[in-house]
Amino acid sequence: VIEPIPFAGLIELDVGFIPASLDRAIAIAASAHAGQVDKAGEPYILHPLRVMLSVPPEARIAAVLHDVLEDSDISSDDLLAEGFSPENLAVLDAVSRRPGESYHSFIVRCSKNPLARIVKLADLRDNCDMSRLANPSLADWARYEKYMEAIVYLRGDELC
């Protein structure tokens, strides 16, 4: 059971009003990522929120939840029980790398779902913002190059 974080039915942000299902998705993501930090030491929840704000409305639920299945104990069944649609769960499955799956296979699989492609592109773009890292390491730059190749592929350009 996912612990609820109380929110009003609607939250007013600079992007307008957010329906309750997105409100619930934000609460679940905040709970799932509580205490996690990113590579820059910032609260991890800021990443899915940035991704959510960079996609069209129809992709926002999946965008804010995009790392929940991989990075928490929350399952697809839990999200289904919370009332999220099978369509949203299909997007979440497509943007979640499976155990033993190569990165290339994951990106190819993700590319087959139009909303997953949008969410993953936004995720990768946010992950490629090296300005958030004070002193990027060689590993950070290698990850950046890998993500840029995935962006090229997901945009429909040639696979590098």
Locations of regions flagged by a protein language model:
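Active-site helical microenvironments for divalent-metal-assisted chemistry
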Residues: 2-160
